Amino acid sequence: GDGYIPMGASRDQYPNIIDIIRRAADEAGRPDATFDIGIMPGWAYIGDPPDDLPPAWLTGDPEHIAAELRADREVGANVFHLKFRGRTIEEYLDQLAAFGEQVRPLL
């Protein structure tokens, strides 16, 4: 399907971006076109990141991370490209599990 991932766009820009896409679809004769809007935040880490971890943009407890993702959804994002920080494969897998077990149920 069709979609767009605005790179570096702030939440307040999403409604305008979506409007531009809808108008372009209308002008192309596709008034009922459906499309996905993605969000790709910087690196994420569930919990308090260790001091020796490279910087992560989306950090905090599961409630905070879920609130941030819900805010993205409220402005029109419906596809989330998340990438988690981890110093080892085990830590990375722990982050993935924490997202599935602790954050996803809050979405």
Where are these regions (language model features)?
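Active-site-adjacent structural elements that line small-molecule/cofactor binding pockets in enzymes
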Residues: 1-107
